[in-house]
């Protein structure tokens, strides 16, 4: 479950604070789909970055907290913003609206997939076994495993976005935060 309690954020600018989120409260339960809609600039991306704990100057949390709790691999966990541990990111993933902000353009995709998998989740696999699991997952998403040999700059915008979605969902996180995930994707007719 992802729980937000009295969350307020603002951008600290020279000419004053710009408040973005004000006393936000909600809960997202396991297996629940939760959508956020609003006009451009209303704070949707700021909220997602705050939930993923990407707090970068000049953005600050003024008050409130984010709590992530659940179970993964048979073990319970609970984390609170401000006390984030590395394992927070093993349980939550983020799909940005711009794939180029996540993918390293000069590193092959197979290395980027391998680097995104925590060592403890490799289950004593060899690199080849892990890549075989990745290839099988890509096939389930109708992506060719051959794409692993590619560099992101060689792919179209839509293909990069599909790779980001695959990266974000491969480890079956408890929560997937998606910021306009269909950006650059083709409409299927």
Predicted regions and their residues:
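Catalytic Walker B motif of ABC-type/P-loop ATPase nucleotide-binding domains
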Residues: 176-179
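Conserved signature/switch motifs of ABC ATPase nucleotide-binding domains
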Residues: 171, 189
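The feature captures the beta-strand-to-loop junction immediately N-terminal to the Walker
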Residues: 37-39
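A short, flexible loop at the N-terminus of ABC-type nucleotide-binding domains that lies
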Residues: 1, 10-23, 54-59, 81-83, ...
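Conserved ABC ATPase signature
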Residues: 151-155, 159
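Conserved ABC ATPase "signature" region
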Residues: 126-146, 174
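ABC ATPase NBD coupling module
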Residues: 72-93, 111, 119
């Amino acid at each position: 479950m992802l729980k937000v309690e009295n969350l307020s954020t603002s951008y600290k600018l020279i000419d004053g604070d710009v408040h973005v989120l004000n006393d936000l409260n909600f809960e997202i339960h396991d297996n629940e789909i939760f959508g956020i809609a609003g006009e451009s600039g209303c704070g949707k991306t700021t909220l997602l970055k705050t939930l993923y704990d990407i707090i970068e100057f000049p953005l600050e949390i003024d008050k409130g907290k984010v709590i992530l709790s659940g179970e993964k691999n048979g073990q319970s966990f609970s984390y609170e913003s401000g006390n984030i541990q590395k394992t927070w990111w093993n349980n939550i993933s983020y799909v940005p609206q711009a794939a180029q902000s996540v993918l390293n353009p000069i590193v092959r995709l197979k290395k980027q997939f391998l680097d995104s998998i925590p060592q403890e989740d490799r289950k004593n696999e060899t690199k080849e076994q892990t890549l075989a699991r990745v290839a099988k997952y890509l096939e389930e998403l109708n992506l060719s495993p051959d794409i692993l040999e590619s560099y992101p700059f060689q792919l179209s915008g839509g293909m990069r976005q599909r790779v980001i979605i695959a990266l974000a969902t491969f480890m079956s996180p408890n929560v997937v935060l998606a910021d306009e995930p269909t950006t650059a994707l083709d409409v299927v007719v």
